[in-house]
Amino acid sequence: MSTNALIDACLALAREERVAAASEALYEASAQLRWQEALRKRWREARAEASVRAAVSGAAIEGAVVSAQALREQIAAGPKGAGAHTSSKDPAWDAATGLWRAHSRLVGYMPDLVGRTRPVVPATAQLMATLHRDVAGPLAVGGLISEAVVGCPRESEQALENQSFEGGGMLEGGKAALEGAGLRENGNPLLEGGPGPNLGGQELRERLEQIVALIDTPNLPALVRVALVHAEMLTVRPFALANGALGRLLVRHLSVRDGLDPTGVSVSDYYAGRVPGAYAEAAQAYASASLEGVVAWIIWQAEALLEGMRQGSELSRAVQAGTTQR
């Protein structure tokens, strides 16, 4: 798809009545969040707390149940806790700490909320690879997956197992999930499945290029961009595993970069973790490739972002009151 065609398609989606209304509601909620009293001086702490809560929510989507307080204690333990590229030998902990590391990295790329510092963000392909290494690296160190699938888009000839998508991820469902995490059985690669048809060859390469173009093309409608990038990560599945996790990380990154949530304190993973059935249903709707399905997905993404902003407002008040660890 040419750049002009991509822009035209995104603008057409943004003009759809339901999408336009959802976008307006998001900007109103974002403005309210931006002027939270706590964010005047303690926005750094709020962003850090959002990273903890996002990691916990994201881990739950991946089938790993970890408490926020337990993760905070791991982080406080320093390099031997959540901060190093090591394995705890517990896949649930490795998933949670990997997600926290990736979210913390994203915070480092965010502009100051008060001030003029604007860190340099890596090129999109490098950013995606780095975030994927953060998430999947501990699983490779622990021997659960091959290091060859970490940080690298899958080879075009690799076909994905067309497993049903139920909103879960790389740790969901025991053996089936470990197979989905890139393990081998009888010498054959068993990789992550998801909604939509399996892709390979030139089609896979073109769709990955389209994801990068969606991220890089300037002046696209923010809600439409965020929603499409997330959905394409779920349906194209350019990596062997953790595509959903990477998609949700990109949601946070793009929401801040494009001004949808300049605070960086939203927890947009929360909604998908609490209502996984709706997440799966919306992803399947998008994979249908119908206009109604795509719009339904964008509306779901808007709902997730709105709930994430509500969570951001709550955690900002908790940071101000000093009650985040209760």
Where are these regions (language model features)?
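FIC/Doc superfamily catalytic core
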Residues: M1-R326
